Amino acid sequence: MGKLSPCTGRSRPGGPGPQLPLLLLLLQLLLLLLSPARASGATQPPHVVFVLADDLGWNDLGFHGSVIRTPHLDALAAGGVVLDNYYVQPLCTPSRSQLLTGRYQIHLGLQHYLIMTCQPSCVPLDEKLLPQLLKEAGYATHMVGKWHLGMYRKECLPTRRGFDTYFGYLLGSEDYYTHEACAPIESLNGTRCALDLRDGEEPAKEYNNIYSTNIFTKRATTVIANHPPEKPLFLYLAFQSVHDPLQVPEEYMEPYGFIQDKHRRIYAGMVSLMDEAVGNVTKALKSHGLWNNTVFIFSTDNGGQTRSGGNNWPLRGRKGTLWEGGIRGTGFVASPLLKQKGVKSRELMHITDWLPTLVDLAGGSTNGTKPLDGFNMWKTISEGHPSPRVELLHNIDQDFFDGLPCPGKNMTPAKDDSFPLEHSAFNTSIHAGIRYKNWKLLTGHPGCGYWFPPPSQSNVSEIPPVGPPTKTLWLFDINQDPEERHDVSREHPHIVQNLLSRLQYYHEHSVPSHFPPLDPRCDPKSTGVWSPWM
């Protein structure tokens, strides 16, 4: 006699058949196999380690042909996917805010300059950040290093924005050894210097005279050592290197005695020390059993600062500009989970793309975010699929001022507030830039447009462009002219008009820039530590 079906109670001939618990188990296995995290080939969501360098130039790594020795980074890049058409923002705060929100700075109110020490400003508190989304997906989230996304209120701090732990500094730059940052205080008619180093939300006062890259590497490797491999990890390691001030232990400069320019020589040592630090982090991932299920990402936040040893040759411009030298990012992905390795990707990508890419890879959801400007790039990176991104807004800043003018210049060129009839879609006196496929349009004053050859390797320190200083519109075919030497706006007026129309669209859909006056209440005189003051 047949047995009773547990589902219906009816007689079923031919033996026992599958029971309900077994069916549920098979269904769970099927759902697991179809999840985004399984798409990488991992048995669980992958660990994500994101290393962000500060002010690292295009010509500052070995795999871009630099004389600076970076064997660990070179090896990781050679075994991974080099992002050769990858863009960041010209300055610290804009890149970091777009990395963690997946949204353009025109949608955050952060399109003008960066967050100053005493400004009552931070990434809007109603924005959901990458670590919050990864926590919801079951990740442990840790941050080490530079924040620079605002700290005037405790609600702005990393530990209030999704990170389980934080060790680092909150402002834009500081001394590598004393960990003190200096900023203007209006009531002093001068500057105040105070400690800017925290463990969680408490001041970390016991690290004086210890080089910051070494401190941050030690904390990162400790996080890795203490992390259970079965739980997914997100580690955001934002090095101080290689932002000024130019400081490094003497032994790291010794291999670069052939570099005559002192700034470049110190800078080279700083890059080499950072390269060694990256090697120590990847060594820790391997020795503690995490590497085989890790996606390791390396990126700069903006182009190199040529006034402080950095170099972007042969690209035009530098940090703070919309020229390629300011925004074309050095970056790569290394991971055993990549389906293609040892390749160079020419697919268009932007720093806003990391949030949707990593959240999807983690099996998480972006449903709680505001509309994203980033795209999921994992199949592009891992498998070589075409990029879903064809357009990229570099920025629109109608209040732009040139804080880093060309050598011998001391002001931003005067604006012409008229709307030339042939370019009526957008006011071309406004500082703006947009990319569509291979085309890049710039308007207004993009920043210093010189080319800067590597120091000590050329008879000239800079090469100025030829053309009127009042020029406010350029079009380049970046695929054919990555050095931005040939303006082709006159040859392609229809492309100019289309891109100006797109700039006007973005301009109309942007939020007002939030750049409040400095608040004298920020003064850390009473505590000696830069801290929230509101």
Swiss-Prot record:
Residues listed as glycosylation sites in the UniProt record: N189, N280, N292, N367, N427, N459
BP terms from Gene Ontology: anterior head development; chondroitin sulfate proteoglycan catabolic process; colon epithelial cell migration; dermatan sulfate proteoglycan catabolic process; positive regulation of neuron projection development; regulation of epithelial cell migration
Assembly behavior: Homodimer.
Enzyme class: hydrolase
Catalytic activity: Hydrolysis of the 4-sulfate groups of the N-acetyl-D-galactosamine 4-sulfate units of chondroitin sulfate and dermatan sulfate
InterPro entries according to UniProt: Alkaline_phosphatase_core_sf, ARSB, Sulfatase_CS, Sulfatase_N
Modified residues (3-oxoalanine (Cys)): C92
Phylogenetic placement of the source organism: Eukaryota, Metazoa, Chordata, Craniata, Vertebrata
Protein name in the entry: Arylsulfatase B
UniProt GO MF annotations: arylsulfatase activity; metal ion binding; N-acetylgalactosamine-4-sulfatase activity; N-acetylgalactosamine-6-sulfatase activity
EC number: 3.1.6.12
Function: Removes sulfate groups from chondroitin-4-sulfate (C4S) and regulates its degradation. Involved in the regulation of cell adhesion, cell migration and invasion in colonic epithelium. In the central nervous system, is a regulator of neurite outgrowth and neuronal plasticity, acting through the control of sulfate glycosaminoglycans and neurocan levels.
Signal peptide: 1-41
Keywords: Calcium, Disulfide bond, Glycoprotein, Hydrolase, Lysosome, Metal-binding, Signal
Cofactor: binding details: Binds 1 Ca(2+) ion per subunit.
PROSITE patterns for the chain: SULFATASE_1, SULFATASE_2
Cofactor(s), names only, from the UniProt record: Ca(2+)
UniProt family annotation: Belongs to the sulfatase family.
Pfam families recorded: Sulfatase (PF00884)
Any one cellular-component term (Gene Ontology): cell surface
Organism expressing this protein natively: Mus musculus
Major localization class: other
Keyword Cytoplasm: no
Positions annotated to bind substrate: K146, H243, K319
Disulfide bonds: C118-C522, C122-C156, C182-C193, C406-C448
Coiled-coil features, chain-numbered ranges: none
Subcellular location: Lysosome; Cell surface
